[in-house]
């Protein structure tokens, strides 16, 4: 007996008005993730995934392109307001926030969540080049 054709249902995107942009700016790369208030990821992009390799990956321009791509990925959710959480000392901190602002999001507040040890692990030895 022939099986009935299976129709794929189109997933309905939930509408989210407020989101949280998590920016992880390391010395080597910048990762931008936009989540809803509960922390469920809606979209993400990286400088390396945006076509930058090697030392170009750790530039402010690469971080800006990653932020633009992430903003484009979450446009369909209807996010208007963004809360920004910045982590890390990388060169892409400022340019990522500027790119998100230019993408049409209203940035409500910016928080630095860089982990600072209370004299935790011993740091690695100094580089000798």
Swiss-Prot record:
GO molecular function: rRNA binding; structural constituent of ribosome
Any Gene Ontology biological process: translation
GO cellular component term, pick one: ribonucleoprotein complex
Classification via SUPFAM superfamilies: Translational machinery components (SSF53137)
Keyword rRNA-binding assigned: yes
Keywords carried by this UniProt record: Ribonucleoprotein, Ribosomal protein, RNA-binding, rRNA-binding
Pfam families: Ribosomal_S11
Biological function: Located on the platform of the 30S subunit, it bridges several disparate RNA helices of the 16S rRNA. Forms part of the Shine-Dalgarno cleft in the 70S ribosome.
Family to which this protein belongs: Belongs to the universal ribosomal protein uS11 family.
Quaternary structure, from the entry: Part of the 30S ribosomal subunit. Interacts with proteins S7 and S18. Binds to IF-3.
Database matches in NCBIfam families: PRK05309.1 (NF003698), uS11_bact (TIGR03632)
Name of the featured protein: Small ribosomal subunit protein uS11
Designated gene of the protein: rpsK
């Amino acid at each position: 007996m022939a099986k009935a054709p299976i129709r794929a249902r189109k997933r309905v995107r939930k509408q989210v008005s407020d989101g949280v942009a998590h920016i992880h700016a390391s010395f080597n790369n910048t990762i931008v993730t936009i989540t809803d208030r509960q922390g469920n990821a809606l979209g993400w992009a990286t400088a390396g995934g945006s076509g930058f390799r090697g030392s170009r990956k750790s530039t402010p321009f690469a971080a800006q392109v990653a932020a633009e791509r992430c903003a484009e990925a979450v446009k369909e959710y209807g996010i208007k307001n963004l809360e920004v959480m910045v982590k890390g000392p990388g060169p892409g901190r400022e340019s990522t926030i500027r790119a998100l602002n230019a993408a049409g999001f209203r940035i409500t507040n910016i928080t630095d969540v860089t982990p600072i040890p209370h004299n935790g692990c011993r740091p690695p030895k100094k580089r000798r080049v």
